Every structure is written in C-alpha cells, then in structure tokens.
Amino acid sequence: MAKEDLLTLEGVIDEILPDGRFGVMLENGHRIIAYTAGKMRKFRIRSIVGDSVRVEMTPYDLTKGRIVYREKVGGGGPGGVRRRR
C-alpha cells in the first residue's frame, strides 16, 4: 500500500495497553488502538495518558493506527529538571 493512501488524524491517548499499544480517542469521537511508529520507538519517545498525538490509519481498517507524532508540551525548557543517564 502506498503512503499516499494513509489517513492522518489527531487524537488524545486515553489508555495504555500491553505490548506498546495505546487507546487513542480521535477528534471525531472514534476510539482506536494504536502503536508507536519505528522512529518513536528507536529514539525512545515516551507517551502517557493525555498526550496529543498524530495517528496514521489505513482506509481498510479504521480500528487500528500508528502514532507518528507526539505534540510537544511546554515546561521542558532551559533550566528544567534533567535526568542523568
């Protein structure tokens, strides 16, 4: 399937499920099950309940999707608390 056929929607994470999956409530009121995309998993971008996310979905299965972007939330600017590795 070509990337041009994907639907991109905005939503909010409302539940954390096992195996790296999330329950996402979309802006249009539908609820889907989504997983994190490869780049988000590679760079260990964490998502929690209440985060605004951008989800890609195929038109063939409108109950599943892939989280491709997590909206940045303020409060992590200069002088913030840093965690050591």
UniProtKB/Swiss-Prot annotation:
rRNA-binding found in the keyword field: yes
PROSITE patterns: S1_IF1_TYPE
Keywords, sorted A to Z: Cytoplasm, Initiation factor, Protein biosynthesis, RNA-binding, rRNA-binding
One Gene Ontology MF term: translation initiation factor activity
Localization of this protein: Cytoplasm
Listed InterPro entries: NA-bd_OB-fold (IPR012340), RNA-binding_domain_S1_IF1 (IPR006196), TIF_IF1 (IPR004368)
CDD domains associated with the record: S1_IF1
Record Pfam families: eIF-1a
GO cellular component, one term: cytosol
Domain S1-like: 1-72
Zinc is among the record's keywords: no
Membership in a protein family: Belongs to the IF-1 family.
Oligomeric and partner information: Component of the 30S ribosomal translation pre-initiation complex which assembles on the 30S ribosome in the order IF-2 and IF-3, IF-1 and N-formylmethionyl-tRNA(fMet); mRNA recruitment can occur at any time during PIC assembly.
NCBIfam families in alphabetical order: infA (TIGR00008)
Function: One of the essential components for the initiation of protein synthesis. Stabilizes the binding of IF-2 and IF-3 on the 30S subunit to which N-formylmethionyl-tRNA(fMet) subsequently binds. Helps modulate mRNA selection, yielding the 30S pre-initiation complex (PIC). Upon addition of the 50S ribosomal subunit IF-1, IF-2 and IF-3 are released leaving the mature 70S translation initiation complex.
Protein name (record): Translation initiation factor IF-1 2
